[in-house]
Amino acid sequence: MDEAILQYVKRKYNLLIGERTAELIKINIGSAYPQENPQSIEVKGRDLMTGIPKTLEINSEEVREALAESINTIIDTVRITLEGTPPELAADIVDKGIVLVGGGALLKNLDILLREVTSLPITIADDPLSSIVLGAGMVLDDEELLHTVTFQY
């Protein structure tokens, strides 16, 4: 997602920004779903035409546009995964919903967008970044659990 923001700013404004700046933009004003009150942030980088440092303002709608392809990939992956879900697991998902984990879960309003697209309950893990590692550790420690959560092709 950071790379998508970096490329968007480069393409639209001819401004080269760093990865950390792109990440700060995502964290501060990035959103997967339109916000009631759009926000903006001042961005500093190097003008690719003149080579001189430059400052500009980018708003949350532009960031959402920059993230659209990444967000659509997430949506498509969720849909494909749900379509291939065994009936027993599908029933659990309808009852309990989907829990978002990982860095993407921290993107504002991703849960709202996925709820709208899937009509399923969506929650964000209490600690989305650690949840992946903890979950993987639990599965690797329990061979029976590993077989129940993996698909064989």
State where each predicted segment sits.
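Phosphate-binding glycine-rich/basic clefts of nucleotide- and phosphate-handling proteins
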Residues: 1-68
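Residue-level signature of catalytic and energy-coupling elements of molecular machines
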Residues: 5, 78, 100, 136
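Interdomain boundary/hinge elements
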Residues: 16-21, 92, 127-128, 150-151
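Acidic, glycine/GT-rich loop-and beta-edge segments that sit at the periphery of enzyme/chaperone cores
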Residues: 18, 138-153
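Active-site lining segments that contact anionic ligands and/or coordinate catalytic metals
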Residues: 38, 53, 95-96, 119
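Phosphate/ATP-binding catalytic cores across multiple sugar-kinase/actin-like superfamilies
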Residues: 66-93, 139-142
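Glycine-rich phosphate-binding loops at beta-strand->alpha-helix junctions
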Residues: 90-114
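Conserved phosphate-binding/catalytic loops in two-lobed NTP-binding clefts
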Residues: 112-135, 146, 152
